[in-house]
Design a protein with these regions (language model features):
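Aspartyl protease catalytic core from the pepsin/retropepsin fold
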Residues: 22-25, 29-39, 68-132
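Long, low-complexity, charge-dense
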Residues: 136-137
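Cytosolic, positively charged, low-complexity intrinsically disordered regions immediately flanking transmembrane
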Residues: 14-15, 39-62, 66, 73-83
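Canonical alpha-helical transmembrane segment with a positive-inside/aromatic-interface signature
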Residues: 1-46, 51-53
């Protein structure tokens, strides 16, 4: 189990962003990453109801090379930049803020600035949860 963790609040533009240390478990291994706590990420898998974490291109490559990882479906997401479809893979768990949840990872082809994953809003304290976009299989 992962205890503690650190939170970073970084100024960027007009607002602030909260970065937490997260541990992503998949297969027989785990990866420690910096993750953005995004109250706007409401992505969930429609079949299971599990949260969907969006991961950077670099982290996506690491996950794709893990034993037993395969594309299990796609998530449709809409942002200011447009609508897009991302492949998803199953994770054994994501630990953040002292809590572990089973989740999916949406594999992005983008590099993120200062973090490697974007957490779904129910995964961290302060997240509101609620309805959102769904992953299709």
């Amino acid at each position: 189990a992962v205890a503690g963790g650190r939170a970073i609040v970084a100024s960027r533009g007009k607002g602030q962003r909260r970065i937490e240390n997260a541990v992503i478990s998949v297969g027989s291994g785990s990866l420690s990453v910096e993750a953005l706590c995004d109250s706007g990420n409401t992505l969930t898998d429609v079949a299971s109801g599990l949260p969907v974490v969006i991961v950077s291109e670099n982290l996506a490559q690491k996950l794709r090379s893990a034993d037993g990882v395969r594309i299990e479906g796609f998530v449709e997401a809409a942002t200011v930049g447009g609508q897009f479809s991302l492949p998803i893979v199953g994770l054994d768990g994501v630990t953040v803020c002292g809590r572990t949840v089973k989740a999916y990872a949406a594999l992005s082809e983008r590099t993120f600035d200062g973090y490697e994953a974007i957490l779904q809003n129910t995964m961290f304290d302060g997240g509101r949860g609620g309805r959102g976009l769904s992953a299709k299989r």
